[in-house]
């Protein structure tokens, strides 16, 4: 299958439409040059290695220790990246080449730097924790001190008031009161207290739990701290309250301590003595200033160390990633029996054979190997991977095609046509040259700044737009083209190419139908005559035009898809598919909808008033009836009968012969009677055989083949109708876009203009801009994009595209520097 070239004779080879010719190669590499060989092949990026040790676990492979070593170095580099990111230290651009440094030196250097950085971080964390604890302690001293000082003042005031009252009372009562006072003083209970901070969101629950646990035998006061404080345990900012709890007895104290621990409340010692409090505040403030100086010095040393790491970070990162990738690939190679050579197998394009051999030779010379590597091509029945060479212009279109399914090996590539048809169908739905210019300007910014933007991390949506910038460029150019055809600039018509061909008979003709218009000049040379816009017949005329145009475009693209199936069949030498798939499909589709397209063109050319709906419906319901006024050309009835007969005959031609022919070819192949039919087998059977590897006699289930063909036939017959109707979305979305644009212009911009008020005009212009950008340039663009995508995936590609291949994924270093592990 793969070895066959393009179709000969009248058929072009279509090299641009086929994936690159691939070959399965075997490399026998000496152990001493294996590492350098894989490195050079990674730089080349044209070999997809096969895993020859798939039965072994990762730990049983030859280079498991080296991969573990590289993984440890990669962990250290990730640690450095996180630390640099937190400190705001950027990594400098790579200077020098990674080949100039030795991996052992890198490993030693990384280990030393990590140990030093970990030690600095540990010391800094301890100092920062102490600093945060002292900050909390200082707040407790301040807030609790305020509470105690206010309590002392209020107690002193109350005592003075009580003494003054007692002095004025009767002298007979004085001994009695003094006796009572002396009795009370002997019964006084010593109260203890605890101070600390509790998170504010837990403060109410904390107070309630304390009250219940001690049965109300506590007194608690809380004070709010205005600014958030850094918690010493978590290192995060938190809003907290200072609390003071008074209790009686050791049992109550133990309960309070447990509750404080459960709520994460930090406790700090506190003295009742006011003089001692002031002394403690002074001591804490002094220690805080000392710690602050020490922490700043530690952070400065840490930043110097991180800047040293940043100078070589990119170089080390690339070196470690490359080494890890090389050892992963070496683990896919198998040892030969002598354990002196490694054997590799993989896919590569045929054109790369010379480059691969040059890389092998350079690796042998550079590693001073006594023996060179052996390169040989293997014969196989496996299906090769699919490889299309793309550039930055075509890669996005190829990604759109591959999102549906990767092409089978050397299957015709829809991307060749999609480069043009996708933006064109988008533009049919988005035809407005004003909107097209807006999208063009935005896309030109992405293209002009592509070098700068390519090196930056963009958001998900922006990343997607940047990746498809050339697709959007084509979409905008085609939108300008179709907008000129529709003669719409933000829904406003302009006589760009010539004056209108029509004039009004009287002043009121703009409100009438086209009967009020007189043709006074030549037909408008390009696109739609601007006189249609604003007339009563604008909508019926545009509906008729765009609906018929959608059918013509749809039938043309579906015919292109069927023609591509012919070239696929020629390429894979499957005459069964030519005679019993391509020809019946072409006959069926064009007998019905090809005929409808011809009628549309004839009606346009002749100006006939024939009802094409009536013609097509009664072509099936009453084929023998006369057409009458709906006849467009002589012998139309006879032609319709012939076309209807051909359409009916083509259905059994698609369904019945192919399964029986495949069965006969299978029997002949395995009875040894004939070998010629091998080339004419259906390509789907080739894939099954190839996938089976060494199976000599594949199973042939006639019932499965017949049911598959039955489904395929029914799908095509019904799809011919539904797919044609599906292309009417071109008409519907184009009409919706035009009407929305017209509504925004007339009901927002013109309405605001009519008020003669500058404020209303500014508001109206802003609403018009936001509505145009948000709805028409964003939502409508996305909607038209998705509908164009569906038309290509379903209506076009299902006519010929199997898409059951797998992508060529070579071993390469190109993306190693940009991808995160």
UniProtKB/Swiss-Prot annotation:
**Protein location:** Vacuole membrane
Q: Which InterPro entries does this entry report, sorted A to Z? A: V-ATPase_116kDa_su, V-type_ATPase_116kDa_su_euka
Q: How does it sit in the membrane?
A: Multi-pass membrane protein
Task: Give the keywords, sorted.
Answer: Acetylation, Coiled coil, Hydrogen ion transport, Ion transport, Membrane, Phosphoprotein, Transmembrane, Transmembrane helix, Transport, Vacuole
Residue stretches in coiled coil: 97-144
Which GO-annotated molecular functions does the record name? Answer: diphosphate hydrolysis-driven proton transmembrane transporter activity; proton-transporting ATPase activity, rotational mechanism
Q: Which GO BP terms sit in this record? A: proton motive force-driven ATP synthesis; vacuolar proton-transporting V-type ATPase complex assembly; vacuolar sequestering
Q: What does this protein do?
A: Essential component of the vacuolar proton pump (V-ATPase), a multimeric enzyme that catalyzes the translocation of protons across the membranes. Required for assembly and activity of the V-ATPase. Involved in vacuolar nutrient storage (e.g. accumulation and storage of nitrate) and in tolerance to some toxic ions (e.g. zinc ions sequestration in vacuoles).
Family named by the database record: Belongs to the V-ATPase 116 kDa subunit family.
Can you state the subunit structure given in the record? V-ATPase is a heteromultimeric enzyme composed of a peripheral catalytic V1 complex (components A to H) attached to an integral membrane V0 proton pore complex (components: a, c, c'', d and e).
Q: Can you name this protein?
A: V-type proton ATPase subunit a3
- Gene encoding it? VHA-a3
């Amino acid at each position: 299958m793969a070895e066959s070239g393009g179709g000969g004779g009248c058929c072009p080879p279509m090299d641009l439409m086929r994936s690159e010719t691939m070959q399965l190669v075997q490399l026998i590499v000496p152990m001493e040059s294996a590492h350098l060989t894989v490195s050079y092949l990674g730089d080349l990026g044209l070999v997809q290695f096969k895993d020859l040790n798939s039965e072994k676990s990762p730990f049983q492979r030859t280079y498991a220790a080296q991969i573990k070593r590289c993984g440890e170095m990669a962990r250290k580099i990730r640690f450095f990246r996180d630390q640099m990111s937190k400190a705001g230290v950027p990594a400098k651009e790579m200077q020098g080449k990674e080949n100039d440094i030795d991996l052992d030196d890198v490993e030693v250097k990384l280990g030393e730097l990590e140990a030093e950085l970990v030690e600095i971080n540990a010391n800094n964390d301890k100092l920062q924790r102490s600093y945060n604890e002292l900050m909390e302690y200082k707040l407790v001293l301040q807030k609790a001190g305020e509470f105690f000082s206010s309590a002392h003042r209020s107690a002193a005031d109350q005592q003075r008031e009580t003494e003054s009252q007692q002095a004025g009372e009767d002298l007979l009562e004085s001994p009695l009161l003094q006796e009572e006072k002396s009795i009370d003083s002997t019964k006084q209970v010593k109260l203890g207290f605890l101070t600390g901070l509790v998170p504010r969101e837990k403060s109410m629950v904390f107070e309630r739990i304390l009250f219940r646990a001690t049965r109300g035998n506590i007194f608690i006061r809380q004070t709010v701290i205005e600014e958030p404080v850094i918690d010493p345990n978590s290192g995060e900012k938190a809003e907290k309250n200072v609390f003071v709890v008074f209790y009686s007895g050791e049992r109550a104290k133990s309960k309070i301590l447990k509750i404080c621990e459960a709520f994460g409340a930090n406790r700090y010692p506190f003295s009742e003595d006011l003089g001692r409090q002031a002394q403690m505040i002074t001591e804490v403030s002094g220690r805080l200033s000392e710690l602050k100086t020490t922490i700043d010095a530690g952070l400065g040393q840490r930043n110097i160390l991180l800047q040293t790491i940043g100078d070589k970070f990119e170089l080390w990162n690339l070196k470690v990633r490359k080494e890890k990738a090389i050892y992963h690939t070496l683990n896919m190679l198998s040892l030969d029996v002598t354990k002196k050579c490694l054997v590799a197998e993989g896919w590569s394009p045929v054109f790369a054979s010379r480059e691969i051999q040059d890389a092998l030779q350079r690796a042998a010379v550079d590693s001073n190997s006594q023996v060179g590597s052996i390169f040989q091509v293997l014969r196989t029945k496996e299906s090769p991977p699919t490889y299309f060479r793309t550039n930055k212009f075509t890669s996005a279109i190829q990604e759109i095609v591959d999102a549906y399914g990767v092409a089978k090996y050397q299957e015709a590539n829809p991307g060749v046509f999609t480069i043009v048809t996708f933006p064109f169908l988008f533009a049919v739905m988005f035809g407005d040259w004003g909107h097209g210019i807006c999208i063009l300007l935005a896309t030109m910014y992405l293209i002009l700044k592509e070098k700068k933007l390519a090196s930056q991390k963009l958001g998900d949506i922006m990343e997607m737009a940047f990746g498809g910038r050339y697709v959007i460029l084509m979409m905008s150019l085609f939108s300008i083209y179709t907008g000129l055809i529709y003669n719409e600039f933000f829904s406003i018509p302009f006589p760009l190419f010539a004056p209108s061909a029509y004039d009004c008979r009287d002043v009121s003709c703009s409100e009438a139908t086209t009967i009020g218009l007189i043709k006074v000049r030549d037909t408008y040379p390009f696109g739609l005559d601007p006189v249609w816009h604003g007339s009563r017949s604008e909508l019926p005329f545009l509906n008729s035009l765009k609906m018929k145009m959608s059918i013509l475009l749809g039938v043309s693209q579906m015919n292109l898809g069927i023609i591509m199936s012919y070239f696929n069949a020629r390429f894979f030498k499957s005459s069964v598919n030519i005679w019993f798939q391509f020809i019946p499909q072409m006959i069926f589709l064009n007998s019905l909808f090809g005929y409808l397209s011809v009628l549309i063109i004839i009606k346009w050319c002749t100006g006939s008033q024939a009802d094409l709906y009536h013609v097509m419906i009664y072509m099936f319901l009453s084929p023998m009836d006369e057409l009458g006024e709906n006849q467009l050309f002589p012998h139309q009835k006879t032609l319709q009968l012939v076309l209807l007969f051909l359409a009916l005959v083509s259905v059994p031609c698609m369904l019945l012969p192919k399964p029986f022919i495949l069965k006969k070819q299978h029997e002949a192949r395995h009875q040894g009677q004939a070998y010629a039919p091998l080339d004419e087998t259906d390509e789907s059977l080739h894939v099954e055989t190839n996938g089976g590897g060494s199976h000599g006699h594949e199973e042939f289930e006639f019932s499965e083949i017949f049911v598959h063909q039955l489904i395929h036939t029914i799908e095509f017959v019904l799809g011919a109708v539904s797919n044609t109707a599906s292309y009417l979305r071109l008409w519907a979305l184009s009409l919706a876009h035009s009407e929305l644009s017209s509504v925004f212009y007339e009901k927002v911009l013109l309405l605001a203009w009519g008020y003669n008020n500058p404020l209303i005009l500014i508001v109206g212009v802003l609403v018009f801009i936001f509505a145009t950008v948000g709805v028409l340039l964003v939502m409508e663009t996305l909607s038209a994009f998705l509908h164009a995508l569906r038309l290509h995936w379903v209506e076009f590609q299902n006519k010929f595209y199997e898409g059951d291949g797998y992508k060529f994924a070579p071993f390469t270093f190109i993306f190693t520097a940009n991808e995160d592990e």
